[in-house]
């Protein structure tokens, strides 16, 4: 299928098959489509709503064209969000990555700079003194030896450059906003994924089910966070043993008291890093305790997804231990030191 055929199909409110979507995505990612065609394609998909087949095909092509990272370590997991929730919270998923590593997991963290937020995961990682410009084999060594490594998305998805202009000019969410979390360059099959709307929870779980994922939790909280929230109910679509189940979680279900998010918003990577370091330390003021609990909720779920705990609640206990013992702070320092060797 060529670009004009695809645009005519979408303009008629007709869906593309998985293979047709792969054809069109290759045209886009190989630089063979004009900016006008890419913009029309992205907006047309959004207006008619992307199907499971279309998202699956697009994900396959992004994975196919990515610069991969081969990691020889298990259990390998990622904690990632779509972004776009507008809450400007500190970098919960990045903080949780160090906690999971401290609990015995291996985290291949995939992320980018902030677009809608004031501190994206890459901004935080860089501020922590961690080298963003590593080769794939160097990232793999970080994961294997430290337990955590960071893959800077633009370095692994070079073909995305062809869509940057049209995406920026459109200025709204498109299919690319939901593809990032599903295109981890290390090929992880265990993930905690946060999304900006509950409507994406099950579709993303279904896409990853088709693509062979082992254990996935896709989450969105009632207050709109792409995280498990400390303040309210979080909706979950969980893929485990080949089956998808949907349910709601409260902080109390995981052994944590519900609390407001006041004090957890930040104005940039500096503030985010300071709050994470406090949470990893021995401070017991109210805001630090909230941050620690928020990290524990998400790290605990990831520890469970990694297979290191029988339940997410057990994972939360392990996460709190990893922070209280100083091991999580140690992982952050170790990665900063080790990554600067390259």
UniProtKB/Swiss-Prot annotation:
Binding site for anthranilate 2: 167
This protein's GO CC annotations: cytosol
Entries under SUPFAM superfamilies matching the protein: Nucleoside phosphorylase/phosphoribosyltransferase catalytic domain (SSF52418), Nucleoside phosphorylase/phosphoribosyltransferase N-terminal domain (SSF47648)
Keyword Transport carried by entry: no
Protein's UniProt keywords contain Metal-binding: yes
Positions with a binding annotation for Mg(2+) 1: 93, 227
Residues that, per the record, bind Mg(2+) 2: 226-227
Pathway as given in its UniProt record: Amino-acid biosynthesis; L-tryptophan biosynthesis; L-tryptophan from chorismate: step 2/5
Cofactor: Mg(2+)
Biological process, per Gene Ontology: L-tryptophan biosynthetic process
One Pfam family this sequence matches: Glycos_trans_3N
Binding site residues for 5-phospho-alpha-D-ribose 1-diphosphate: 81, 84-85, 91-94, 109-117, 121
Cofactor: binding comment: Binds 2 magnesium ions per monomer.
Coiled-coil boundaries: none
Complex and partners: Homodimer.
PANTHER family, sorted: ANTHRANILATE PHOSPHORIBOSYLTRANSFERASE
Family: Belongs to the anthranilate phosphoribosyltransferase family.
Stated name of the protein: Anthranilate phosphoribosyltransferase
Upper classification of the organism: Bacteria, Pseudomonadati, Pseudomonadota, Gammaproteobacteria, Pseudomonadales
Gene: trpD
């Amino acid at each position: 299928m060529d670009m004009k055929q695809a645009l005519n199909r979408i303009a008629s409110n007709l869906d593309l098959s998985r293979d047709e979507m792969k054809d069109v995505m290759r045209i886009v990612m190989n630089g063979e489509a004009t900016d006008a065609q890419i913009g029309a394609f992205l907006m047309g998909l959004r207006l008619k709503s992307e199907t499971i087949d279309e998202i699956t095909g697009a994900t396959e092509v992004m994975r196919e064209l990515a610069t991969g990272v081969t990691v020889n370590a298990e259990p390998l997991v990622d904690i990632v969000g779509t972004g776009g929730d507008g809450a400007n919270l500190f970098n919960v998923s990045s903080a949780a990555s160090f906690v999971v590593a401290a609990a015995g997991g291996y985290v291949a963290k995939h992320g980018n700079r902030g677009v809608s937020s004031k501190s994206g995961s890459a901004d935080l990682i860089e501020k922590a003194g961690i080298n963003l410009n590593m080769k794939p084999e160097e990232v793999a060594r970080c994961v294997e030896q430290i337990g955590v490594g960071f893959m800077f998305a633009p370095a692994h998805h070079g073909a995305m450059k062809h869509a940057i202009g049209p995406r920026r000019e459109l200025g709204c969410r498109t299919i690319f906003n939901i593809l990032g979390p599903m295109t981890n360059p290390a090929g992880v099959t265990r993930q905690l994924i946060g999304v900006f709307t509950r409507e994406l929870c099950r579709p993303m779980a279904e896409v990853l089910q088709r693509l062979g994922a082992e254990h996935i939790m896709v989450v969105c909280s009632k207050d709109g966070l792409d995280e498990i929230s400390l303040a309210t109910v979080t909706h979950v679509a969980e893929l485990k043993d080949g089956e998808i189940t949907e349910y709601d979680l409260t902080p109390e279900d995981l052994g944590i008291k519900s609390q407001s998010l006041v004090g957890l918003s930040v104005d940039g990577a500096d503030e985010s890093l300071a709050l994470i370091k406090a949470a990893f330390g021995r401070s017991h003021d109210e805001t630090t305790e909230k941050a620690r609990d928020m990290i524990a909720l998400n790290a605990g779920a990831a520890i469970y997804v990694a297979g290191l705990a029988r339940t997410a609640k057990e994972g939360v206990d392990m996460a709190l231990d990893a922070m209280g013992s100083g091991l999580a702070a140690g992982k952050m320092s170790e990665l900063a030191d080790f990554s600067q060797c390259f």
